[in-house]
Regions:
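Extracellular receptor-binding modules and their adjoining Ser/Thr/Gly/Asp/Asn-rich linkers
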Residues: 3-4, 11-77, 104-125
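Terminal beta-strand-rich extracellular "head" domains
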Residues: 78-98
Length: 125
């Protein structure tokens, strides 16, 4: 028989903001909160007014000109040292440059991309 756990909220027993999960097949543990994606978006940068096609924890999107976009994060990050991952389709390679601040990130492409995808990992405020 398969076990099933149904809950609406998880909270650490000894530390409310920390839950350890045993990795698959071993006794190694990882922190659940650290492993979650904190923000992600998908948008079409070639649209005259780019908008999210889908997103999580992202409020608005600003087009600052050819190949330069700013994603605003709904629930701010704890600092500006979070990790970002950006990629795109079409023929516009993504720059490795991203300007991160607590509540948003500016991303750069070689040109206006077709679809652009962006993810954030790190600590929320």
């Amino acid at each position: 028989m398969t076990s099933q756990l149904k809950v609406d909220k998880l909270q650490g027993r000894t530390t409310a903001g920390s839950i350890s999960v045993t990795s698959e097949g071993t006794s190694v543990e990882t922190n659940l909160q650290q492993g979650l994606c904190k923000c992600w978006v998908k948008f079409d940068g070639s649209d005259s007014t780019p908008a999210y096609h889908d997103s999580f924890n992202a409020s608005s999107l600003t087009d600052h000109g050819t190949g330069e976009f700013q994603v605003f994060i709904t629930n701010d990050m704890g600092n500006d040292d979070y990790a970002t991952f950006v990629t795109s389709t079409f023929y516009s390679g993504m720059s490795s440059e991203a300007h991160t601040i607590v509540g948003s990130v500016r991303i750069f492409t070689a040109d206006d991309p077709g679809y652009a995808y962006y993810q954030v990992a790190g600590d929320l405020a």
